[in-house]
């Protein structure tokens, strides 16, 4: 997020492609392209908001967000608190983990989750898929008593 430049974006009919030059899961700096599709509900659509941000900010080159990783962490704390959550429980890492967990709950297969999170092995992404499925995927649910 903090290292995305305007030239890393490619808007296409389906949404936006973002070239990530380097990330925690790509230490060698090979880079990877991620896609954000348009959401049905515009009020939740990150592509719509990104376009609006670029329009308002008049950014045409360089960083799309002039922000540091520490500032992102502070924003996460601020807005989780404003939303009524315990901000101490939230970070960039917990949001990534939450994405993997919610995706799994909605039936997204591990490979697809891995393509978004950048994990190289199923074992690593499984660490992110938290215990949320303990009841959903419980064998006792199959026993009708």
Specify the residue positions occupied by each region the protein language model found:
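Short, basic (Lys/Arg/His-rich) helix/loop patches that form interaction surfaces
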Residues: 56-62, 73-115, 122
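Catalytic-site neighborhood detector that most strongly recognizes the C-terminal catalytic loop/helix
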Residues: 117-142
């Amino acid at each position: 997020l903090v290292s995305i430049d305007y030239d890393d974006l490619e808007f296409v009919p389906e949404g936006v492609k973002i070239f990530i030059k380097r990330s925690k899961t790509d230490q060698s700096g090979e880079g990877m392209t991620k896609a954000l599709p348009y959401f049905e509900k515009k009020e939740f659509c990150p592509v719509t908001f990104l376009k609006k941000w670029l329009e308002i900010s008049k950014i045409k080159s360089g960083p799309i967000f002039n922000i540091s990783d520490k500032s992102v962490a502070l924003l996460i704390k601020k807005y989780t608190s404003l939303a009524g959550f315990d901000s101490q429980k939230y970070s960039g890492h917990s949001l990534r983990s939450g994405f993997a967990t919610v995706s799994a709950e909605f039936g997204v297969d591990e490979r697809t989750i891995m393509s978004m999170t950048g994990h190289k092995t199923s074992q690593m992404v499984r660490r992110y898929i938290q215990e949320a499925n303990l009841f959903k995927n419980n064998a006792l649910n199959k026993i009708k008593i």
